[in-house]
A protein has these predicted regions:
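Polysaccharide-binding and catalytic clefts of secreted carbohydrate-active enzymes
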Residues: 1-176
């Protein structure tokens, strides 16, 4: 079972931290490639309901694919079920449990197209900036793209500096992922 009250409380607390307490000093730490991941883990682990929420999402993804498998088998058991999934780190947030889904799928295919990932940076960044306009946009962008592993940090792949650098690319334009 799941502790829904703790899920509600802790996910709300994490949302409140992001919307009302997150500061530039937090963003600077989150923007660091390794240290940022530890900071994010610390924020999540200090709220056990967030981990429980992620477990719930994973269980729901397995239940959904199990139900699809049963529906397909009821009509034609020879039909294949091919599940599609975002790649990590998105699988953690979306709740996809590769091993659980694989039990009921004939294949699990990663979504390798990443054009829209940049829009996720823009969406999340705009939402946080709307809640906290005093945040440093450059630090926010660096934190988001670091946590989402969207740049190498090398001279050839330094990552963008503003939310405007992250949008759906034109067909002939390289995208920032």
């Amino acid at each position: 079972g799941f502790d829904f009250e703790t899920i509600r409380s802790d996910v709300s607390a994490l949302k409140r931290w992001l919307e009302t307490e997150l500061g530039d000093e937090d963003l600077a730490e989150l923007a660091e490639r390794d240290r940022g991941r530890f900071r994010l883990a610390r924020e999540v682990l200090s709220r056990p309901g967030v981990v429980e929420w992620l477990r719930l999402k994973a269980a729901l993804s397995v239940d959904l694919v199990r139900d699809w498998r049963q529906a397909i088998d009821a009509v034609d058991p020879d039909k294949l079920l091919m599940s599609h999934a975002f790649m990590p780190p998105w699988t953690v947030v979306t709740g996809l449990d590769f091993s659980g889904v694989a039990e009921f799928s004939d294949a699990v295919s990663p979504k390798l197209y990443t054009m829209h990932w940049a829009q996720m940076v823009t969406f999340w960044g705009n939402e946080l900036m709307a809640q906290r306009p005093e945040l440093n946009e450059r630090l926010l962008v660096r934190a988001l793209i670091s946590l989402l592993d969207m740049f190498d940090g090398t001279p050839g792949d330094p990552g963008g500096e503003s939310l405007a650098d992250y949008r759906y690319p034109e067909p002939d334009e390289p995208h920032p992922v």
